[in-house]
């Protein structure tokens, strides 16, 4: 079985890669190497996925600003799904999203782009996993990494007598990476 991991170098993707590479053949795809959508080599890039039985999309621009960032978050998953359908390829497509898409008050670019991606993936053969805050533990201790490092840095500010949480606030119900796989 061949499993393709998109975003294999990120916090979640690298963990999934480490766990699954012990049992399966892994195809690693880096979207930073992806040609522009209108580039003649874009189809060749998509063909890299053709031999995959399972595709796990962990790629995301957490602070999307550029046209490319938004393409990665909201358009690429649907583009890939349509490509694989066109190739008449049987595969399982797992798209990682965020639990924040369910919070209507969340208006940050990342959440909006993930919400759009989910809408575009409706009526496709895609499994969407909405993940909460992910944490990594080592020897029973929470490690600074992923989005948790933002919270650690925030709480490490020494000059504030209190720590305001900006509206709409965040609901932190962390899940350890070990519980994902």
Where are these regions (language model features)?
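Conserved Rossmann-fold NAD(P)-dependent oxidoreductase catalytic core, especially the SDR/UDP-sugar
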Residues: 78-113, 123-132
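Flexible, glycine-rich beta-alpha linker
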Residues: 102-108, 129-152, 170-171
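Non-catalytic, hydrophobic alpha-helical segments
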Residues: 55, 180-181
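N-terminal Rossmann NAD(P)H-binding glycine-rich loop of SDR-like oxidoreductase domains
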Residues: 3-22
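Conserved cofactor-binding/catalytic machinery of classical short-chain dehydrogenase/reductase
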Residues: 76-80, 116-117, 176-179
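NAD(P)H-binding glycine-rich loop region in Rossmannoid oxidoreductase-like domains
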Residues: 37-79, 99-105
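The catalytic Tyr-centered alpha-helix of NAD(P)H-dependent dehydrogenases
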Residues: 69, 106-113, 173-177
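A conserved pocket-lining segment of Rossmann-fold NAD(P)-dependent short-chain dehydrogenase/reductase
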Residues: 153-175
